[in-house]
Regions:
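12-transmembrane solute porter fold
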Residues: 11-33, 46, 228-242, 248-426, ...
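Flexible interhelical linker loops that connect adjacent transmembrane helices
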Residues: 3-6, 181-209, 251-266, 327-328, ...
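C-terminal membrane-cytosol helix-exit motif in multi-pass small-molecule transporters
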Residues: 122, 174-193, 209-221, 238-253, ...
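Peri-membrane helix termini and adjoining interfacial loops of integral membrane proteins
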Residues: 180, 421-432
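Interfacial helix-cap and linker-helix signal at transmembrane-aqueous boundaries
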Residues: 38-39, 70-71, 156-164, 219, ...
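Intrinsic disorder in cytosolic terminal tails and internal cytosolic loops
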Residues: 1-9, 194-197, 462-488
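Membrane-interface helix caps and helix-loop-helix hairpins in membrane proteins
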Residues: 100-101, 165, 191-197, 222-228, ...
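Transmembrane-helix bundle of Major Facilitator Superfamily
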Residues: 1-186, 321-322, 329, 333-335, ...
Length: 488
């Protein structure tokens, strides 16, 4: 084999894996601007419409650790294709949905598919590229796709809903997924260390996945029922009980689904805290900003989607610079700068008025937050995998994505609760509906800005600059084939 062959093969495989990842990120937000149309056609009640978003986030966040560990134990390409098949089939089912229950079920299965697929894809990337400049380049592109995918989803959702119909936001995944399934066996290497014992931690998987699903469910339903409602408290108590049981199980079993020793990697722990807070601030910023544009400024689905183009283009434009800065100086400063920008963008957006204008009131905060995603997603992706052993690659990538999805669910739930509560207070005080809605969104944006800024002390306390700088300094490219157990 020539020295060029593995390089070309790796980047072909990376392109396919990146497309699969991009689909999962886009589907987090692509339905946001389509919700009114979906609600009308499928006869959702106003309170139940949130489950079109929540069902996906719930299963996505809940099953990520399970998907990551399954990839390490059962073969990463095999699990990737299983998840991709589920995601594609569920996308088709969602497009063909004729009722509310069918749509929610399809979105839940779509989330499971994404949770199985995503850790496998990222761990394959990690094992194709050795630590150093080339892995940083790959993860820089990966992080850039994550940063731009959320805003691209809103834009694509607006365009498709306006000109084709909401069904096409789901049809879009079907041909892409089908082509990826055909190409994956040909260009994506299978990997699994032969030394890994294939014992599956069933008790830990059930307790951990069940606890995460209940946690996301409790957070998601809290805006509807209230944080003090018996139903919310009961679900939260169940989540806590299962998660405590999960920790006890993981301390005792021989082959845990989440070896707790992985948190001794301080950089990994810091990156996951930053990922949690990034999801809690930026994903919720998109949610609140879209509601403000549609409910207060009366933007159409297309207008609301296109408005986010400013953030998306900024993120894409700065992704290369972010990757270069990380390679030269490590992740800590770049990550902290990115989270500062996201927090600052949300706080700037608190100044939006009732009769707002895009250029005067929205473009600036969106550009600042978009820049923040480029400088946050990329170093977080790199730091979360720095120093991780190959046999734990799926686990580490699943852990990072779990942090981001749980953060998004928590942030949206908190923002919804704060906005709804403050809006009701203003309405009872005699304010007109547009002013009350705007006041509620402003209050929520203050909270989201604070969530973003909370990441800064965690980054400086936990992320070790020397660990990542050492990895960045290694420029040798590893041929992955000897380390991979090829399977037919």
């Amino acid at each position: 084999m020539t020295s060029q062959s593995p390089h070309i093969d790796r980047w072909r495989a990376f392109a396919l894996l990146a497309v699969a990842f991009f689909m999962t990120v886009v589907d987090l937000t692509i339905v946001n601007v389509s919700l009114p149309a979906i609600g009308r056609d499928l006869h959702f009640s106003q309170t139940n419409l949130q489950w079109v978003v929540t069902a996906y986030a719930l299963t996505f966040g809940g099953f990520l650790l399970l998907g990551g560990r399954a990839a390490d134990l059962l073969g990463r390409r095999r699990i990737l294709m299983l998840g991709l098949g589920l995601f594609t089939a569920a996308s088709l089912a969602a497009a063909l949905a004729t009722g509310a229950g069918f749509m929610v079920g399809a979105r839940a299965v779509q989330g499971i598919g994404a949770a199985i697929m995503l850790p496998a894809a990222l761990s394959i990337v990690m094992n194709m590229f050795g630590e150093g400049a080339e892995r940083n380049k790959a993860l820089g592109i990966w992080g850039g796709l994550g940063a731009g995918g959320a805003t691209f989803g809103v834009i694509a959702g607006g365009l498709l809903t306006q000109y084709a119909g909401w069904e096409y936001i789901f049809y879009l995944n079907v041909p892409i997924g089908a082509v990826a399934l055909l190409l994956a066996p040909r260009i994506v290497p299978e990997s699994r260390l032969e030394t890994v014992r294939r014992r599956f931690d069933a008790a830990g998987a059930l307790a951990g996945t069940g606890g995460l699903v209940l946690l996301v469910a409790a957070i998601s339903q809290a805006p509807q029922y209230g944080w003090g409602a018996t139903r919310t408290i009961a679900v939260l108590a169940g989540a806590v009980a299962l998660l405590v049981a999960f920790l006890l199980i993981e301390r005792r079993v021989t082959d845990p689904i989440l070896p707790l020793s992985i948190f001794r990697l301080r950089t990994l722990a810091g990156a996951n805290i930053a990922g949690l807070l990034l999801g809690g601030s930026f994903y919720a910023f998109i949610f609140v900003g879209t509601l403000y544009m549609q409910q207060v400024l009366h933007y159409s689905a297309l207008q609301a989607g296109l408005a986010w183009l400013a953030a998306s283009l900024t993120s894409i434009a700065l992704a290369g610079l972010s990757q270069a800065l990380v390679t030269r100086g490590g992740t800590k400063i770049v990550m902290a700068a990115g989270m500062t920008m996201i927090g600052a963008g949300a706080i700037w957006a608190t100044q939006v008025p009732v009769h707002g204008h895009f250029l005067a009131n929205l473009a600036g905060p969106m550009v600042v937050a978009g820049a923040g995603t480029a400088f946050a997603f990329i170093p977080i992706s790199i730091a979360a995998l720095a120093g991780v052993k190959e046999q734990q690659a799926g686990l580490a990538s699943g852990l990072l994505n779990t942090s981001q999805q749980l953060g998004g669910a928590i942030g949206i739930a908190i923002a919804s609760s704060v906005a709804a509560s403050h809006t009701q207070t203003l309405l009872h005080a005699g304010h007109a509906a547009p002013a009350a809605l705007t006041g509620g969104f402003q209050q929520a944006l203050w909270v989201l800005g604070a969530i973003g800024l909370l990441a800064i002390p965690a980054i400086f306390a936990l992320v070790r600059r020397e660990a990542v700088s050492t990895a960045a300094a290694k420029t040798s490219v590893r041929d992955p084939q000897p380390a991979l157990a090829a399977t037919s």
